Amino acid sequence: MGSSLCVAVRKKEKQKQKKTVVFLPEIPEEMLIDILIRLPAKSLMRFKCVSKLWLSLITSRYFTNRFFKPSSPSCLFAYLVDRENQSKYLLLQSSSSSRHDHSDTSVSVIDQHSTIPIMGGYLVNAARGLLCYRTGRRVKVCNPSTRQIVELPIMRSKTNVWNWFGHDPFHDEYKVLSLFWEVTKEQTVVRSEHQVLVLGVGASWRNTKSHHTPHRPFHPYSRGMTIDGVLYYSARTDANRCVLMSFDLSSEEFNLIELPFENWSRTIHMNYQGKVATCQYMRLASDGFVDVCVLEDADKSQWSNKKTFVLPISQMNFVHGDRLVVGASRDSGKVLMRKANLLRNQHARFFLYDMERNEIARRIEIRPSLLGSFNKTNQFLKVCYTFQTK
């Protein structure tokens, strides 16, 4: 009797130990992508090891293109570097949320350190969440979200050199363009040469096939801008002639475009309704005027008639007096403005001016506590870039 009772108890224990396996229906791939696309990049890097399916989805071009859609939430970065000491730099980041001030202007606060120890040097360009920067002749590409860095082959030319970085949407490739040039004592460019590198395994520099007028960058550390797979950058052919160069990232063809303004000082190039435009702000500090011409035909160097935008009276106190630094924004029809010099322990403020709506669309602030040694002198910084990424 006792032995049979023990057997019965053991059977019940074994039954309890049995695990119930429930087979759940598989999540459709499109639904899985919709879920994963909402996650930050750091989480996606970890989730690649969940399964082979997740790895293939996260690393696919389709997923990457959806992840970097302009409409997706973006984070604002600021990159500061000292021209005299390229190892002295800061990479700062805004929090994900923004607030509104009393005038209903969106306010973003750059309040987080994202500095990566082995970075440094000048920022070349930011494209679809990746940063390209250089120190000397070393060019590197960094993903600030995953903190991964790739160093490109060293450029061996002994002449002057500068770079640009962009994304070719037709072939879904990232390319780095290098320009080498030689000038006379009169600053006339006698020779220039371009090389291009496609980012990937075994990447190497090669000469471009397209011929072009010898030129050099408009000024040192000159950044370009990309619209629909075409890279645009300012250039000089001699001391008295400035032009706009275009480089098709797919066909790798160059085009020289004459500028619409005879006086090209204090001009920037920007995205205006999907077209490249030249913005001249010579009269901004005195009168609040910004003049814009839009490129209509690149082959004929044909521009639209000049259109003048007038800054709101409420913002004239900001632009009046001290020298302004004006830069292009990723957003169409908007420019970034900041003071060239700031006082110690003062917030670094940037304004995103929407020319179409004639209003300050966004205010960007950098907390003084993040600036460290950059805040020890009245000369706030030598080079400052702000850019958006996923």
Swiss-Prot record:
One Pfam family from the record: FBA_3
Xref: PANTHER family: BNAA05G37150D PROTEIN-RELATED (PTHR31111), F-BOX ASSOCIATED UBIQUITINATION EFFECTOR FAMILY PROTEIN (PTHR31111:SF25)
Classification lineage: Eukaryota, Viridiplantae, Streptophyta, Embryophyta, Tracheophyta
Protein name: Putative F-box protein At3g52320
Domain F-box: 21-71
PROSITE patterns in UniProt: FBOX
NCBIfam families, alphabetized: F_box_assoc_1
InterPro entries according to UniProt: F-box-assoc_dom_typ3, F-box-assoc_interact_dom, F-box-like_dom_sf, F-box_dom
Top-level taxonomic group: Eukaryota
Disulfide cross-links: none
